[in-house]
A protein has these predicted regions:
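Mid-to-C-terminal secondary-structure elements
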Residues: 137-146, 164-276
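Short, surface-exposed beta-strand/loop "edge" segments at domain boundaries and coil↔beta transitions
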Residues: 72-78, 120, 245-252
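The feature marks short, hydrophobic/small-residue-biased sequence motifs that occur predominantly
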Residues: 106-151, 156
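Hydrophobic beta-strand segments of well-ordered beta-sheets in folded domains
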Residues: 61-69, 107-111, 161, 211-215, ...
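Membrane-proximal extracellular/periplasmic loop immediately following the first transmembrane helix
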Residues: 39-114
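Solvent-exposed, acidic/flexible segments
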Residues: 82, 132, 161-162
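Extracytoplasmic
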Residues: 62, 126, 134, 156-159, ...
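Gram-positive cell-envelope targeting signals
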Residues: 1-47, 277
Length: 277
């Protein structure tokens, strides 16, 4: 008989220990790289809403700080209280011998309400959206990625413009490219200014709640929920970027002069999140 067909098979040699060690090391490095990428993405999302001081500072040689005031349930602010605080803040700058730059400002702020269920519709679809009333330069502090269009702000001439998140835009129109389209709220037309992606970090998810969302100006929300004769929607979050001549100045101004200083929870956001931590 030919020995080729029935030849004894060679025994396969076991893999060298060195090769196995290198293989395990490569697997471990891949796992670590994936974990780091996830963490980096998470931190980047956090930094988006914590970097207003750096954005506002620009090329200025002044130091700026970002601080926030959060209101407990039942102790929300009104816009008139914020306007009063503006006057106090400007006097604080005078007392500290801080000069307002030409064509500039020593501070910028924003405020927002807790999300409310508001019914919004098109000619064919009706949806209940988590709606947040915003004031000041809200999207300086929350520069959500635009899928289309633009943001809204207090500088708008009218309050009948809204920003949809991508989930609501898809539910209403089946598209994200809907800037300029019309939606109806309480039988009144509102123009879609833009469509944004929502923040993904845990803190933002808790603040904005789950589900399709919409941003309207604080004035619009006041109108939608009953007009000027009704109680104003409560402002639950106030955010401020301001000049800080010495460390801790911004937070101390809030603690000393904010309208609800005995009830608010204050936080300094600048440098709060860092890859070094």
């Amino acid at each position: 008989m030919s020995g080729g067909k029935f030849a004894r098979r060679r025994k396969r040699k076991p893999l060298p220990l060195r090769f196995l060690a290198l293989l395990l090391l490569n697997v471990a490095l891949v796992v670590l790289a994936v974990v780091f990428a996830v963490k980096l993405h998470h931190v980047t999302n956090l930094l988006i809403t914590q970097s207003a001081a750096e954005v506002w500072k620009g090329q200025s040689e002044e130091n700026f700080v970002q601080v926030s005031a959060f209101q407990p349930v039942g102790k929300e602010l009104t816009e008139s209280q914020i306007e009063t605080f503006h006057q106090t803040l400007e006097q604080k700058f005078v007392d500290a011998s801080l000069e307002t730059p030409e064509n500039g400002s020593l501070y910028q702020d924003a405020w927002s309400t807790t999300a409310q269920d508001i019914t919004v519709s098109t000619n064919s679809v009706t949806y209940t959206a988590k709606t947040i009333g915003v004031g000041g330069d809200f999207f300086l502090f929350h520069p959500l990625p635009l899928r289309s269009g633009s943001y809204i702000s207090n500088r708008d001439f009218t309050y009948d413009r809204v920003v949809l998140d991508e989930e609501l835009s898809w539910a209403l129109f089946g598209s994200y490219d809907v800037a300029g389209q019309t939606v109806w709220i309480s039988n009144e037309p509102y123009v879609v200014a833009g469509v944004v992606s929502r923040e993904k970090d845990k803190a933002s998810s808790k603040a904005y709640t789950d589900g399709a969302g919409m941003f309207v100006t604080y004035s619009a929300l006041t109108h939608i929920t009953g007009g000027e004769e009704a109680k104003e929607p409560g402002i639950s979050c106030y955010e401020l970027v301001m000049a800080e001549p010495i460390t801790g100045y911004g937070l101390s101004v809030l603690r000393e002069s904010f309208p609800t200083k005995d009830k608010s929870v204050f936080d300094q956001n600048t440098n709060r999140y860092s890859l070094k931590n």
